[in-house]
């Protein structure tokens, strides 16, 4: 909702007044007369600043930068995420780092896509995919930290009261929807309902980045930001580029702008405000028009060169393509004279008209209704300035009263020329980036568009008209091949793609669409146009109502359940107030004449203030805490300097084309350098450690080669001349990977480096219907016809996971594959207020005006939450715990107090260090044991890699990285050394640990790794012992082979798997029921109605049964364990679900834990109330690297830890390099074959797992894992988001890990330098939103692999259940991490929410070598079929 509101605000000011609070992410967005888009569909940043429509690096960079800027400007999405989490967007990093990273990320972006559409309608589907809607749904733009609202949509088609989002529609961050349905088209005409960030303005991007810091963390705030940054700051920035003349004349000109268009159906403002009015296919309910809009071509590196076409059923216009069709190159100015006044009507590509009136001697007209447009006289022609896009449109070709479009250009002289013949026919389109298009005519209409620069003759689009001049076929080779049917009145009655998708329309006598339906019954609706409202009845008979004001802006909307949202506007259509159904109110004020937001007040009364300079550029922001951010600009209007509340600075350098070339800090230290070729395509990006990644392109500006800093090259191949998605990847090891897509850009199949084939099947509206893995297992998916939300997942064994929705499309009941049911209730605003589990335990939730959780009430406890003015969580309390949090000026958590323990952090940005101190109450008074606080100092490189840790006892651990940024050496104490080697793919091949003597390593532990073509681990040699793994096509272990020097090769274990992938070891009894383990050999398992293990019994002949009993609380936290020997262990947790203690009264023992984020930092062991031992742990990511032990009264003993590839500690070394302890052998699933109680043993299992000897389980942060059965003992807290199996661990524990017991995070395949090469994960619906944020340790680790300014980016996103530990992070540009990547994750989340579990695979490319990836390949599969994928530049 926030995203939608922001988008609407940005585009129209107040027109976005129709979004429902928290609309289902999977609801489709309204389409604009083009193929409707849906979750998972690709978005791209246009060549605004070089963002190639396809996947050119230059475009990527421009797109990335633009996206970042947009992201910041429209902070609509990113902030929303931050708000929801109650944490500042930049909580993980400083302002400078964040900004630098974002800019760098944008620059590094070389992928053809910037993320997917993240959400859609919950009840309207096209091609079985939820239809995305403008102003309501978001995209996961990899350039932003948060979801970005779709800002544009159909002008005539609305879905759930929101304009349908389609191909070519833009998001508030400036990205363009690139994919959509292949057979369905929604309402022509493109309405802009929210402000759109300038993709062309790099400096604006910087501003946007800054804005990110300003975005209030509340939902309401996010809404305001959308309006503010898109319409305000962005407009200001654009205005600055327009020049001082525009500023000087705006006051005199504004009064001359005609407002009649505003009230007429052709008014642009009306269209923007009506975005919300697009329902179902592309029906614009405000007028009843059907609007079909599509973008067939997108090219260009600087200025976006796009060909957009829009059909409007009520239009009599005849354009290049035929009757009723408008297009980008047919925009025209129509001039009429009335005495001394000159009236000019500008007709835009979306079919809208804007009226301007020039009085005598007036040279420029500014329209208060459309503050983004200013019209200037230019001799006999006119120039239209679009401040939001920072572009000029010249209308200088005279044809009677008409002035044809002749050029489009920006403030940096990037230019698109439209070359016409003497009769006015458009013959060529030439871009200053070097692109030339040839237009081929057939009679009076356009027949073909060909690209002819560089000697090529590539067909980009082909059209065919019937005898009556109506477009009947459109074949955009980069997008869709569509067919159109019309009635006798030339109104569109049907469109289809000759495949599975189609849409049909019926009209009344007034030409209004009264009925529409689509393939398979999706998006069916009937419209009744009443005098005071419009009533829409969907295919299930559910009614929604909408009211409009005199400006045709939605003034209220009523959901099927009767919830009413109201909107109030000023005379110019700016949104003043939005009142949710529950009465939550957000407010905006604006600067006179400019439409710039001056203040935003959230629902709790907290206010943000915005200041502008004389050029109307945003120059200052003040948040409710009084923190201030400021911007300074160069002579060209580019942002030159950004200053944060702590006086830190980020400086930017730009080239003559407006492209970012350098980012540096206040001291002049360069953080990133970017270089472009003569066509403004990004050629290379160099980070702060001088690691350079390089890109190469073909004649169509597609990336064909990416080179890491270490020289490794990845080559990309394309199936056909105009295809923009690479379908072939030749890796540095000469292995080939293949992908096959359909015309809708749906991934149909994927062949990995082993030749294993995964397949996917799609239905109407590109909804995934089946996924088959490489072993032939198939999952099927079913959807709700109205919301297109996933309602059923059918596993290969026939078991079902189902969801039931209410009339508003919200999940009210869920039943997993074991039959466990969960029920949900919501308030009027869509906030979940009750959850009831299978045992009948109910948890109640209360929220404040901002939608932030205030109280959680359960039968066994009540939690209270407090926040500061900007929405940061500051305090949480329960009956047994009290937590207080403090932040610095950059929103970094610097103090966490919990029941007597205190964790503090001191950050020195100049020195790139973080000092962590652990303190316990009472230690200062304990003079006997001298328990001093534990202080550790972490040092980082300029790119963020952990470089050194100085420990409390004076010892230190130093990490060294190679040219590719991979960890190559570790040295600690007086002699400990570890060396790592990598292959050409960057996968770790050898790791040697031991002592250093005379400059040489005397290794006592050597581990060598071998991989298959898909990057799966197939063998490990440990000293003289070797173990091999025979895998199936999906990478699961089938056999374990042992051997070694002088030893025969034996098969030590064989594994089979159920149809759903659960393990069954050959020769052993393993029984699963509906995905839950019920018997393993002699061990029997019993569960309660909530699906939690309550009894484990071991029955062996001749012995008494051994019984363990387990008791859980309402939050599914294990509280009590009764063991066979009569012991009872009690577990305690903090409000965040972290276990902070356990005790056994029978043994008089107690263990307490002090946490640093999601990792244990210190453990204290008490006996009879006396402290007997404590341990201090230091992590790098999820890998334990240092353990320190101290017995009461003794000295500290330091152990340097080496771990296996899955995070399991393998050995401990003394500071002099002597082997002190090595782990006993364990089974594939982690069960130790011989338990030893050696004191040095850290007691850790797989990454993130702490062994509990009393229960035989492993504490896994959010759940408990049973290594004997290889599964969890309670349902996944995040549901199907964690995978189709609610209890299963990972598919292959040698390659995958699950550090938090939530998502199935992959075990990372590392390269020779320690860089991450690949990762895999399975995410189910239950895992959604169960992830955790990064901690200082993981951030340090990520930066140790990359740059000091990098974010610790989640490989598997927080929203997907990914944890923030070292095992799930990598160095990532902030702009990408918080922008495109995060937006894409939301798309994935929405898809999972609708379609169920998915398998995710990542491949990391290192164009500059080192350990910092420059490109991330992110592919999502379902049932073996690739659902969608993206490539992220970094």
Curated annotation (Swiss-Prot):
Membrane topology: Multi-pass membrane protein
Gene3D superfamilies noted in UniProt: 2.60.200.60, 3.90.930.1, RHS repeat-associated core
Signal peptide: none
EC number from the UniProt entry: 3.1.-.-
Keyword NAD: no
Location(s), subcellular: Membrane
Annotated GO MF terms: nuclease activity; toxin activity
Keywords: Hydrolase, Membrane, Nuclease, Repeat, Toxin, Transmembrane, Transmembrane helix, Virulence
InterPro entries: DUF6531, Endonuclea_NS_2, PAAR_motif, Rhs_assc_core, RHS_repeat, T6SS_VgrG/RHS, YD
Family named by the database record: Belongs to the RHS/WapA nuclease family.
Protein name per Swiss-Prot or TrEMBL: Probable deoxyribonuclease RhsA
Taxonomic source organism: Dickeya dadantii (strain 3937)
